[in-house]
């Protein structure tokens, strides 16, 4: 369920606040700032296919750890390299892809763990947590940007992603030890 929360949180915060973050980097051109969302969306559309294919071939737990690590790296690099147009495009494409990858990979893990009627209930919970993330993401990251400046856009989401990685890694490790 954590992956759906992360997807909702990162998706809503990044799509909603990206134009605000981008504005100083595009000479206060509102149209150019809004167009940055297109690079984010292109990653959201293209990379989930690759992530789904990888999920069929490799250990999903390790793939989730890799995906989260990429998200953390990208989010910490965004404030540093966003002024470079080629890096901006690459980082936004990757951010969009890993964000949607949380959803794809989370659903595949859910489908492996639950079957039948229980899967229906688990899927409803999955969507519920996604919605909670979508509601919390923009105000939390927006407040961080108010308090700590424009760079908090990437850094705050990076810290949240790091917390998710820690919780995911340690809870999965505990579950595997008990089995």
Where do the protein language model's features map onto the residues?
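A late C-terminal transmembrane helix in Major Facilitator Superfamily
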Residues: 116-147
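A membrane-interface helix-boundary motif in multi-pass transporters
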Residues: 143-161
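Transmembrane alpha-helical segments of major facilitator superfamily
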Residues: 35-44, 126, 130
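Pair of pore-lining "gating" transmembrane helices in MFS-fold secondary transporters
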Residues: 1-13, 93-97
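Intracellular juxtamembrane helix-capping segments at the cytosolic ends
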Residues: 100-114
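Short amphipathic helix-loop junctions that connect adjacent transmembrane helices
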Residues: 16-32
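Structural signature of the two symmetry-related core transmembrane helices
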Residues: 62-77, 158
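Helix-to-loop junctions at the C-terminal end of transmembrane segments
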Residues: 47-59, 145-146
